[in-house]
Amino acid sequence: MAAIDVRNLSVGYGQNVLLQNLNFSVNEGEIFVILGGSGCGKSSLLKNLFGLYEPLAGNVLIEGQDITDAHGEDRQKIMTHFGVMYQQGALFGSMNLLENVTLFMEEYTTLDREQMNLLARCKLDLVGLLPYEQYMPSEISGGMQKRAAIARAMALDPKILFLDEPSAGLDPITSADLDRTILDLSQNLGITFVIVSHELASIYSIANRVIMLDKASKGIIAEGDPKVLRDQSPDPRVHQFFNRIMSKEVP
């Protein structure tokens, strides 16, 4: 069974259709990256996949359960299957790292405070931040904040993590450290990652498979191993995209 199955999905706002009739799946344990130029609907697609936005049409199945038709308790159960890290990380500045990680445990679990703290420390340890549990977000680096946000996204032991531009704003060395964290979590815990990114080094080093979205056609123009697509795709739009990434000129 696929971790995520997307069927005839159309994404947009009101009469503004960004993407239409998308069909693809994400395998369990896979690092799956969504590519495309600015304005093509990458982040909007991601938010449709985890249910923040409702699609214009079509369905998204997570672990075989249709999130687009789920409501109430059924929807809450599905939501415990995944975690989300937004582009800015969005840690709460008035809480230390331990408190940030336990935040959603308070709402979605029946654990007592001691149990929540123990579980949160395990998550911080997985991303190399256990010694910093009492630090405030403002007291740690941007890369550490991103790793803390991933720890918080793992608070409910999800099988899937959705990450929106996790390397945004990071220097190459810090970005590579974050990539290693993602790879470790995928390989050691079997977590499925769905990532929006345009960082070429990250894409090549961690992605098992990518899809490339196109603004003009409102669809998927390529799918597969990113290096194979770069070297062998017959579609000139694919080569143009990779060339623009290399020159940091993604439109």
Please tell me what each predicted stretch does:
Residues F50:
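Helix-to-loop junction immediately C-terminal to a conserved catalytic motif
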Residues G58-D66:
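Conserved ABC transporter NBD signature motif
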Residues R113-P131:
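Conserved ABC ATPase "signature" region
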Residues M136-I140, M144:
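Conserved ABC ATPase signature
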Residues A155-K159:
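A short, proline-enriched helix->beta-strand linker immediately N-terminal to the Walker B motif
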Residues L161-D164:
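Catalytic Walker B motif of ABC-type/P-loop ATPase nucleotide-binding domains
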Residues A216-F241:
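Conserved beta-strand-loop-alpha-helix hinge in the C-terminal portion
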